[in-house]
């Protein structure tokens, strides 16, 4: 049986049976206990907006993006200006970003977030688990991306990166 050919009692042929069964499971779970994730985009946004703790001082929802197609975590690169005009500082990388803006045509400006005590070598970070999240700070390094190139976003708990 291929996609769309599975039959479940009470589910019409036009409906996706896996989708319907998962909906039924969620409905049943919601009847038993509040179905709330401790960490999710919704929770991070609520924390940022102070809905869970007003006046908490949080200002950023850090995100990790996953490239469409291979579904691998996206690592951004950039550098600050060097010590003088026309010079480039040390190249840095990060899997974790602060969304600065999103345009109508789904392009976004992302700022690299890093722990200043984490080594800055670009080869050091092979995947998001290699990156320290203990003391993320804004870097001032921004990149522009096409959001149509991503298939997944992970929101980390809301934090404060500005003093």
Where are these regions (language model features)?
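Short glycine-rich, low-complexity segments
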Residues: 1-163
């Amino acid at each position: 049986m291929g996609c769309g050919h599975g039959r479940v009692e009470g589910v019409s042929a036009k409906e996706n049976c896996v989708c319907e069964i998962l909906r039924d499971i969620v409905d049943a779970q919601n009847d038993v206990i509040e179905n709330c994730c401790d960490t999710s985009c919704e929770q991070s946004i609520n924390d940022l907006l102070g809905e869970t703790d007003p006046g908490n001082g949080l200002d950023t929802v850090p995100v990790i993006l996953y490239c469409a197609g291979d579904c691998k975590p996206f690592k951004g690169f950039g550098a600050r200006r060097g010590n003088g005009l026309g010079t480039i500082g040390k190249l840095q990388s990060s899997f974790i970003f602060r969304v600065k803006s999103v345009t109508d045509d789904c392009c976004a400006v992302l700022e690299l977030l890093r722990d200043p005590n984490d080594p800055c070598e670009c080869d050091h970070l092979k995947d998001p688990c290699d990156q320290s999240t203990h003391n993320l700070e804004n870097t001032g390094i921004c990149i522009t991306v096409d959001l149509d190139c991503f298939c997944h976003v992970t929101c980390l708990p809301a934090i404060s990166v500005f003093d």
